[in-house]
Amino acid sequence: MQRNTILHKTLARALSMKRPHNSEGTRRLTDWLALNAPAHAKMHRDEVGNLHIDARQSEANRTLFVAHVDTVHRDEGPNKISKTTTHWRADGAPLGADDGAGCAMLMHLLHAGVPAYYLFTQGEECGGIGAKYVSDDTAFLLQFDRAIAFDRRGIDSVITHQGYGRTASDAFAEALSEALNADDTLWYLPDDTGVYTDTAEFIDVIPECTNISVGYYNEHSDQESLDIVHFTALAERVARIDWDSLPTLRDPSVKENKWDAYDDWYLGGGREATSVTSFARGHWLVDDRSEEHTSELQSQSTISYAVFCLKKK
């Protein structure tokens, strides 16, 4: 990755700071993002500190890109980064690629001239504080057909479900996967094993809400790393996608439980079930290894971090 690009500058800036919610780190990064946005973009901050950057060129531009500026760090200060030609890591702390990598990807898309609306949210790690605030504005969300986050571990997921519910159609995820894989350097597939990111807050209004693997592993732990080779290849690809040409099929008024398709398959004697496709397609070969490695660390920290977030609100 070239050092003087906005992609590299944003990533290095974000990862160099510990950024717990409502901290000096989140304020400094948000200020930096605003200062380094393209001059022509319309920009404002809302009441909870989310940074909105509108780079749409017409009403036909109906894509919302989302990344969050906060991390799971509990203290503030510098974050010492170790770099190799293939991976970045932090010394004794989470790297913060969740979601510093997403912030860098959005800035890259902005400067590449991709016409869309860009939203940098506050407090995702504390329950989606910024996204929940935005979700109350139905008129705003009705402007979009798709909400895209770059906040998923691994290197191959286009998320169709978060928690137990569907957030994006299979047709959308398949089309986006094909677009990401177009030059044969990436290998993305629809994945129904998503957990949570900001786009989950928009599913009652926006039809296609997804999360794309951005190359980090072992998030929320001091073993977190970022596959910089994959991250760079992804950045090169996403700037060439025609996002507004992607299909829009999911009906936000129809709530689909993750296991509905499996029940149909089981009761119907073997009809196709989208809920088991992630296992069949191989995502678990990546995700299980990551989750297994960090599950103990994450389970130990979940309750105490929730208390920390309450204190920071």
Residue map of PLM features:
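Positively charged, low-complexity/disordered segments
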Residues: 296-313
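Active-site metal-coordination/substrate-binding segment of hydrolases
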Residues: 44, 59-115
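Short, compositionally biased segments
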Residues: 289-292
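Acidic/histidine-rich catalytic neighborhood of metal-dependent amide-processing enzymes
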Residues: 95, 99-170, 191, 199
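A non-catalytic alpha/beta surface segment that caps or lines the substrate-entry region
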Residues: 7-60
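Active-site-adjacent substrate-binding region
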Residues: 146, 160-285
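Short secondary-structure junctions
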Residues: 38-46, 80-87, 182-190
